[in-house]
Structures are given as C-alpha cells and as structure tokens.
Amino acid sequence: MDEKAAPGSETAIFAGGCFWGVQGVFQHVKGVSKAVSGYTGGAKDDAVYETVGTGRTGHAESVEITYDPSKVTYGQLLQVYFSVAHNPTQLNFQGPDSGTQYRSTIFAENDTQKQIAQSYIDQLDKAKLYPAPIVTTIETGKTFYPAENYHQDFLTLNPTYPYIVYNDLPKVANLKQLFPALYSEKPVLVLSASN
C-alpha cells in the first residue's frame, strides 16, 4: 500500500533517535526538498533542546520531511526510515542515546499516512526481517516544532564530529548502497551558508 503519486509537496515526520542522523539521511533522498530537525509529541513551550533532553516532555527528536510524492513516495520514505535511518527494534533508545525523546515513532499527518505506515509495519513483522519485534509507534495529531538552528544541517556541517563519524555517516553510506536510485550526492540544507 502506498499513496498515489501526485505533483506538489507533502510532509512526513519521523522520529528515530538523534535527529542529526535522521535529518542527514533524508537530506540525501531525491525528491526531498527539505528535512528539518525538531521536536514532536509535546507542548510548544517544551520544544527546547535542554527541556526535551530530560525525557519528560512527551517530545521526540524528529525530522519533518517535505517531499514531492511524484518523485519519492511516502512508502519509499518509510523504506529508508526502517532500513537506513534507525533501528526500529530499539525501545526508547538508538545507539548511545536513551530516553523517550529518542523513541521510534512515525507522526502520521493524515489517515492515509497512518494506514500506509501500519501496513508497512505489519508487512515487516510478518516477514520477520528483524531479529527482534518492531517497536515503532504511530502517533497522530501532533505538532512539529523546529529545533534550534545549531541542530540544523548538523551532519553536513560537522562531518568529522566523532558522534557523526561513528553513528551517522554510516547511515548515509547505507542509503547510497541500498537505495542508489533514491540517493542524492548533494544534500538539501535547511540553513543557508551565511547562517
């Protein structure tokens, strides 16, 4: 099940650990025009990195992806999300980061996205592609709040930062290897070079 390809733009919001790596992956997907790091699941007043980091806000570090469904479908974005961007079997942690703010969650923008995401998870569960159960949740009706500017484009701007080298650059390499038709060498950036 996937959405019908239509010109224009749609948004998808995925959470899967630290947003630096998730953003970095989706910035390299053809058909994506923007991938913004932020917070989803909690209140606006709590959408601040230091507060979200407590794990008590309901927010997850997330990425809002703007894409052209005639170039890349929601289903293809889900494939990248589950195969490259994070490990969907880890409950409330990814790599070295732990807490509910690092949970694996799809924030569906509408009923169609919710149905596609649930169908995809069901297919993965049935195929038993992972050594452990998928713990990814689907939430609806949540507002996305952009993160602070210093979190935007972090992977691209800090390619030698040890966390990025160890945790996130391999994800971009896996995207290129597993989905060469979707891979774009040049990332779409949130901030201009002057910021």
Curated annotation (Swiss-Prot):
One of its GO terms (biological process) is protein modification process. It comes from the Bacteria. SUPFAM superfamilies: Peptide methionine sulfoxide reductase. Gene3D superfamilies: Peptide methionine sulphoxide reductase MsrA. GO terms for molecular function: L-methionine:thioredoxin-disulfide S-oxidoreductase activity; peptide-methionine (S)-S-oxide reductase activity. The keyword Oxidoreductase applies. The active site is at C18. Keywords: Oxidoreductase. It holds the Pfam family PMSR. It is an enzyme of class 1 (oxidoreductase). Its EC number is 1.8.4.11. InterPro entries: Met_Sox_Rdtase_MsrA_dom (IPR002569), Met_Sox_Rdtase_MsrA_sf (IPR036509). It catalyses: L-methionyl-[protein] + [thioredoxin]-disulfide + H2O = L-methionyl-(S)-S-oxide-[protein] + [thioredoxin]-dithiol; [thioredoxin]-disulfide + L-methionine + H2O = L-methionine (S)-S-oxide + [thioredoxin]-dithiol. NCBIfam families: msrA. Has an important function as a repair enzyme for proteins that have been inactivated by oxidation. Catalyzes the reversible oxidation-reduction of methionine sulfoxide in proteins to methionine. Belongs to the MsrA Met sulfoxide reductase family. This is Peptide methionine sulfoxide reductase MsrA 2. It comes from Mesorhizobium japonicum (strain LMG 29417 / CECT 9101 / MAFF 303099) (Mesorhizobium loti (strain MAFF 303099)). The gene is msrA2.
